[in-house]
Amino acid sequence: MTSSLYRRIYSGDSLYSAWRKVKESAFSSSSETIRNEAKDFESQLPKSLSDIQRALSKKTFTFQKQTGVAKTKANGNSRPIVLSPIPNRIVQRALLDALSRIKFVKEALDTPTSYGGIRNKRVSMAVADAKEAISKGAAFHIRSDIAEFFTRIDKARVVELVAPHIKCPDTLALFQAAITTDLANIDVLRRQGLDEIFPLGVEGVAQGSPLSPLIANLYLHDFDKTMNDGDVICLRYIDDFLILGKDMGRVDRAFNKAQRELKKLSLHAYQPSATSDKASRGLTANGFDFLGCFLSAGLIQPSTITRERFKKRVKSDLDASIRMMKFSIEAGDIFPKGSYSGALQNLDRVILGWGKAFSFCSNGHWIKSLDDYITSALAQYEMEKTNLFQKTNGTAQRTMLGVRLLAAVHSERTEME
């Protein structure tokens, strides 16, 4: 007999709520492919959700193959991101909502010093709690993150953690399937030598899955409890953590304890050093980076690394648009994201998303500095676009602008008929 927990997963209310959250995330994505996939799914409602509900109720739902994307990090290494089809994400989200009602899971998510991937908790809260601890006398810190965290998670251990509390074979089987990675483009990644960074075996969970933050918080629940039972405070946001204490000795001992706890999970944290951007150690009065912010006395602002990364993203997107406009002229076709109008819309979304993410930071010169940079980058972009314009005719100019030709629309319709 189907359990109430499993029935909750495929209830109409649960699936529709999951779709709303997936839709919000997809529509705000800078990826046109993801936005279009969500639009296609929405255009087929309510059938698209009914199909998922029917498959789940009959226990025939299967997760579609995902796409692996090797995202280049600032240090030149690749971060494995797994992009799942909309139906996968809806079921993962519905599963997340159902599991979040289980007592064991609720206790883990209620941990006061854990912030990432938890409803109604945000980066700003972790930063605010760090500032409060400093104001109460925490004069020293160690900040670090757990090396290769998501790719080192033992999936079998995750299942062992939740199985005694789920007590439903159907839900457990769905959970196991939901955290399994099966890539459609694995051959391409293998030829590029990138297949080994993806969580295809017993180790690792997909970054990008709605379930990944939950798994992280369950996996590190004992770590959170152990690290906050002494005379320091340890704030954690997924795989980043900050230890604050009244003297350096206490903080150092706490960090050594953190390494011992992580070793039990076959994990380790980066050692603080003057040359590393992964970890830091010292006086809180001197300021330090945490969760993309720089914290110092009376001031919270995006860190230098965060701001440089944002500027690089702005320039990279505008440069890519110029290249794609040139290609559009040669191909005689529109590439929306690379067109003039598409590039400006994309940049506006990037600015809005980044600005909201750091809206809790203190006002300061950094805001004007970034706005000045964007204005300068746009002026350069406008100049390059104008140079291209002067070398083309009206039809090519329309293509560059991202405004399709009526004749092309008519031609497409004729071909379909």
Model-derived features with residue positions:
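Non-catalytic, polymerase-adjacent accessory regions of viral genome-replication enzymes
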Residues: 1-50, 55, 385, 395-398, ...
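Reverse-transcriptase-like RNA-dependent polymerase core
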Residues: 55-76, 97, 175-195
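Active-site-proximal segment of RNA-dependent polymerases
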Residues: 5-8, 96-154
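Right-hand nucleic-acid polymerase module
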Residues: 93, 196, 225, 252, ...
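Conserved pre-motif C helix in the palm subdomain of viral-like polymerases
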Residues: 78-110, 200-229
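Conserved polymerase palm-domain catalytic core
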Residues: 132-238, 242-261, 282, 287, ...
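Glycine- and acidic
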Residues: 34, 76-80, 111-113, 144, ...
